[in-house]
């Protein structure tokens, strides 16, 4: 059968340390009292001579001043060995107490590791009023943190939905703009072909009229008229067609230039939607989303989401909320 020392090594070591504490302390304290007994008469004498030296005026009697200082120095020399011995004993007692404290901590760790002390005895009962209050406070803190996290999730989902709607609207506007450009190009190409056909028809009719006239004239007159008609009709026809085409091209170029200038002005006035990393920008501060944010309930709000510090709020508002720009539109 195992002995109690082997069954509970930690508790037995704790008991030994607690029994050794008063013995070691009393031994060293006794030595300190013996040292103080040696100085029981010297300390009052030293204090008396120091007070007398401080109260006396030594403006003229310097010899008395030197004599008193010598007496004080002699008493200090008598007390010095006792004071040094007292410091030595104190340092030894401190080291011994430090060793016993380390031994006690190690024994307690062994007792906890071997479950020598029951949990109820070590931590106390669980039905204490203070423990109930602690559990209630912890439940309130957890419920509050859960409510904040749910609000943050709602705001995040709402922000993602509004961002998706905005991207869909931008895609729809871009496709509409491309369709308008293609229609304009098609109209421009059709009008250009019509002008070329009309110019060609005029040229052919003129050629047929000149040919009919030259058939009735003499050969020399035919040759002369053919040369005059060729030199007269060709440059005018070419210049007319060129002028018409240049006019149409200039008009389309000018319209495109005006549209590009308008787009550049609009892009200069409008706020950037994303930063250099492609992240969307929100709020009056034109920054990315962070922390808790509140969404504007306005139908056509440009900024959409706002940081709580930027609008002067500490918590999320209840019900509908509108930004300053949307309030002006209401």
UniProtKB/Swiss-Prot annotation:
Principal place where this protein is found? Answer: nucleus
Q: Please state where this protein is localized.
A: Nucleus
Known outcome of mutating residue 8 to L:
In strain: SK1
Q: Can you name a GO cellular component term?
A: Rpd3L-Expanded complex
Which stretches of the protein fold into PHD-type zinc fingers, per the record?
280-329
Q: Which domain of life does the UniProt lineage start with?
A: Eukaryota
Q: Where is this region: Disordered?
A: 139-272
Q: Which UniProt keywords apply?
A: Chromatin regulator, Metal-binding, Nucleus, Repressor, Transcription, Transcription regulation, Zinc, Zinc-finger
Question: Binding positions for Zn(2+) 2?
Answer: 296, 301, 323, 326
Q: Decide whether keyword Metal-binding is in the record.
A: yes
Give GO MF terms, alphabetically: histone H3K4me3 reader activity; methylated histone binding; zinc ion binding
Low complexity composition-biased segments:
255-269
- UniProt feature, compositional bias: Polar residues: 231-254
Q: Does the keyword Zinc-finger apply?
A: yes
Protein residues bound to Zn(2+) 1: 283, 285, 307, 310
Q: Which GO terms describe its biological process?
A: cellular response to heat; chromatin organization; negative regulation of rDNA heterochromatin formation; negative regulation of silent mating-type cassette heterochromatin formation; negative regulation of transcription by RNA polymerase I; nucleosome assembly; positive regulation of invasive growth in response to glucose limitation; positive regulation of transcription by RNA polymerase II
State whether it acts alone or in a complex, and with which partners, per the record: Interacts with H3K4me3 and to a lesser extent with H3K4me2. Component of the RPD3C(L) complex composed of at least ASH1, CTI6, DEP1, PHO23, RPD3, RXT2, RXT3, SAP30, SDS3, SIN3, UME1 and UME6.
Per the record, the domain comment is: The PHD-type zinc finger mediates the binding to H3K4me3.
Q: What does this protein do?
A: Component of the RPD3C(L) histone deacetylase complex (HDAC) responsible for the deacetylation of lysine residues on the N-terminal part of the core histones (H2A, H2B, H3 and H4). Histone deacetylation gives a tag for epigenetic repression and plays an important role in transcriptional regulation, cell cycle progression and developmental events.
Family recorded in the similarity comment: Belongs to the ING family.
UniProt-listed PANTHER family? INHIBITOR OF GROWTH PROTEIN, INHIBITOR OF GROWTH PROTEIN 5
More about this protein: Present with 3250 molecules/cell in log phase SD medium.
Q: What is this protein called?
A: Transcriptional regulatory protein PHO23
Organism name: Saccharomyces cerevisiae (strain ATCC 204508 / S288c) (Baker's yeast)
């Amino acid at each position: 059968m195992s002995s109690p020392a082997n069954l509970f090594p930690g508790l037995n070591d704790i008991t030994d340390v607690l029994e050794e504490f008063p013995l070691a302390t009393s031994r060293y304290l006794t030595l300190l009292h013996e040292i103080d007994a040696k100085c029981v008469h010297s300390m009052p004498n030293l204090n008396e001579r120091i007070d007398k030296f401080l109260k006396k005026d030594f403006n003229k009697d310097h010899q008395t001043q030197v004599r008193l200082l010598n007496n004080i120095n002699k008493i200090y020399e008598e007390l010095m060995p006792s004071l040094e011995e007292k410091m030595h004993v104190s340092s030894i007692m401190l080291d011994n107490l430090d060793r016993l404290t380390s031994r006690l901590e190690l024994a307690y760790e062994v007792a906890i590791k071997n479950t020598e002390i029951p949990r109820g005895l070590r931590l106390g009962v669980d039905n204490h009023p203070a423990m109930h209050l602690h559990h209630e406070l912890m439940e309130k803190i957890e419920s509050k943190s859960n409510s904040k996290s749910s609000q943050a999730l709602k705001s995040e989902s709402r922000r993602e939905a509004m961002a998706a709607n905005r991207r869909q609207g931008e895609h729809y506007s871009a496709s509409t703009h491309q369709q308008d450009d293609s229609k304009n190009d098609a109209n421009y190409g059709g009008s250009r072909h019509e002008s070329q056909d009309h110019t060609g028809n005029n040229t052919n009719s003129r050629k047929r009229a000149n040919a009919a006239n030259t058939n009735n004239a003499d050969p020399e007159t035919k040759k002369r008229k053919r040369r005059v008609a060729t030199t007269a009709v060709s440059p005018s026809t070419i210049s007319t067609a060129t002028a018409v085409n240049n006019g149409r091209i200039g008009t389309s170029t000018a319209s495109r230039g005006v549209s590009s200038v308008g787009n550049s002005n609009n892009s200069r006035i409008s706020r950037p939607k994303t930063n250099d990393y492609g992240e969307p920008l929100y709020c009056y501060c034109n920054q990315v989303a962070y922390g808790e944010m509140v969404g504007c309930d306005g139908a056509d709000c440009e900024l959409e989401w706002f940081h709580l510090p930027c609008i002067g709020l500490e918590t999320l508002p209840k019900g509908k909320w509108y930004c300053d720009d949307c309030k002006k539109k209401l």
